[in-house]
């Protein structure tokens, strides 16, 4: 993997990420494709209509169903899903914790029960890499010990030491495997305790292909989250991509870009779409509301997305009310277009040294009215 830092505007960064299957311009938003697809969309929607170059798939879910060996036999995630871009896969640790009532944390890994059939499984740092090798992920995340917030200081210290130990073990194994097309990212933990974040960075080897700021958006306030990012991002290697996991709103993303973050993922655009909430530059609208029943205009005037160029709010209102499956596709295409355009415009602003004014103008407009 090659990461080229092209421009900075104060702390905001614009770069190019060269992966085995694509070249990705940063800042980048990665649509979430948990089961190997973005919910309600296929690979053609992702790559040709949205122009997405990098999407996230979930190691936990692909391991349990259909199984990483099946995906490997079928040519890896790219061939299986017919997606010509790149995949980032997370380690599955978060899902093991959040989806199972019976999780046991051990020094060598995480024991959990499948949310599908109750069968017992062990994720170790090596096991999750082997799964991701079978998936042939462009970017693989190490197994980490995630802590919900608030958390006692002792638990945070345990988490960062265990996460760093697992990360460094993963890096040693990855070097032995000699798989240059599968890049390995470390994850920095420590909650909102800044000293713990510094310690986590210090304990983590500097030889990873990229670094993620994990363990945020799990119960802390927005101010605490931003303070943690502002503290942590400058501690990470400047020549490696920085990934903020699972965040978030348009405001969160712009704030994090201004603090030096390059990569983002979140289920918000697609989940909100399925639940009738659509993003516009003037804020969010709820398409299920009665005023849209006879509204013959697109979701947003001047929006170039597939949906806005073809369909009215009235049609989307009808599809949602009728519980038609097509609604989820059209709404998701719009919301993902909004997010992808947001980071694209942020990138252009960084290249032109006007990011702060771009951010200010966007937020003023976005908060100007509610629908």
From Swiss-Prot:
Cytoplasm keyword on record: no
Instruction: Show the GO MF annotations.
Output: metal ion binding; tRNA-guanosine(34) queuine transglycosylase activity
Q: List the disulfide bonds.
A: none
- Its EC number(s): 2.4.2.29
Q: Which InterPro entries match?
A: TGT, TGT-like_sf, tRNA_ribo_trans-like
What pathway is it annotated to?
tRNA modification; tRNA-queuosine biosynthesis
Write out the ranges of the annotated region (RNA binding): 246-252, 270-274
Q: Which family does it belong to?
A: Belongs to the queuine tRNA-ribosyltransferase family.
Function summary: Catalyzes the base-exchange of a guanine (G) residue with the queuine precursor 7-aminomethyl-7-deazaguanine (PreQ1) at position 34 (anticodon wobble position) in tRNAs with GU(N) anticodons (tRNA-Asp, -Asn, -His and -Tyr). Catalysis occurs through a double-displacement mechanism. The nucleophile active site attacks the C1' of nucleotide 34 to detach the guanine base from the RNA, forming a covalent enzyme-RNA intermediate. The proton acceptor active site deprotonates the incoming PreQ1, allowing a nucleophilic attack on the C1' of the ribose to form the product.
What name does this protein carry?
Queuine tRNA-ribosyltransferase
Its source organism is: Helicobacter pylori (strain P12)
Q: What is the lineage of its organism?
A: Bacteria, Pseudomonadati, Campylobacterota, Epsilonproteobacteria, Campylobacterales
